[in-house]
Amino acid sequence: MNTRDKIINHALKVSCDIYKANKVFVLSNKNRQSETIKAKRMFIYYLYTYMEINHNGMKKYFKSINHASSIHHVNKFKFEVETYKDVSSSFNKFLTEMKKFSMYGGGFYEKRVEIKRLLDELKQITND
């Protein structure tokens, strides 16, 4: 299992822990309980927004999910985070846990932000 997969597995665990959902139910489309859907939405949103997995790429992690379902879950979760304080609070708790989970000795997110900053700097230099 590579580092990226370890981070993704940890994200699944954290989202399931927050909503007390079953991992198997989250990854399959056989359970429509509220906790399962909330954990699934958070996990899909995280994969799309933070791990940069496109909607078609979600098929690797979920049984029988299509891109339209992925788009719906991302948009719905984004709306809920912006609208409901409890969802926003849960997501902040999730992000805090994910930032603690470090595979590189330092924070994964901090290094990713630094890489993006450096890439932008390189683009600016080459365009000048």
List each language-model region with its residue ranges.
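N-terminal leader segment of winged-helix/HTH proteins
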Residues: 2-14
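Short, low-complexity, charged amphipathic interaction modules
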Residues: 107-128
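Short, amphipathic alpha-helical "recognition" segments used to contact nucleic acids or chromatin
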Residues: 37-53
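Short Lys/Arg-enriched helix C-cap and helix-to-coil transition segments
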Residues: 81-109
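Short, basic interhelical loop/turn and adjoining N-cap
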Residues: 56, 60-73
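Short, Lys/Arg-enriched anionic-surface-contact patches
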Residues: 14-40, 65
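DNA major-groove recognition helix of helix-turn-helix
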Residues: 48, 73-74, 78-81
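Helix-turn-helix DNA-binding elements, focusing on the entry/boundary residues of the two helices
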Residues: 12, 54-56
